[in-house]
Amino acid sequence: MLADQSGVIVVDARISVAALAPGARGGRGHPRFAVRPYPQEWERHLVLRDRMRVFLRPIRPEDERLYGPFFEHVTEEDLRLRFFAPVKDFGHAYVARFTQIDYARAMAFIAMETKTGSMLGVVRLHADANYESGEFAILVRSDLKGRGLGWLLMQQIINYARSEGLKRIEGQILHDNSTMLAMCRELGFAIGPDPNDPDI
């Protein structure tokens, strides 16, 4: 350490790092405090019921540009069902929250049409502080409902949560979102009211 009238400079230091406790690692053996690389192993090529070919992969920061055209194909009602309120601002600051994620704490999978590269849907999962449970959210283009895309996205995020060792995942769904509630029942989720909000 060097010190003079202009300040203090540390030129040499020793840092000790204690071993992680058992279970303190995320999926694939990554320590939870590590900056995880892009998880390419989660990329999938899938086919919808109508034979549309879809590329499903983890989201990346540069996917922000895909959100504008995507939101143009989502009705106001579907936006309300996803965000629980009308959404008007789709600017950089808003969309960046969805595309710039820490893979050690969260995951989002984006579905793109293989032929055009256009965004078709997205599913997200954010783990709690203890990395034991997570909350999911999903949004699919309104003109693509009924083709099985939502089902594929949900299966992907469920498989990811299992691989990470999460014990439980849950989502908040408005009580009038009957399609989403029905899909969650089919996927094996337990459905119940939110004691703090009668609309959920």
Regions found by a protein language model. Give the residues of each.
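Long, contiguous binding/interaction regions
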Residues: A18-I200
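Conserved metal-phosphate-binding beta-hairpin within the catalytic cores
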Residues: M1-I15, F136
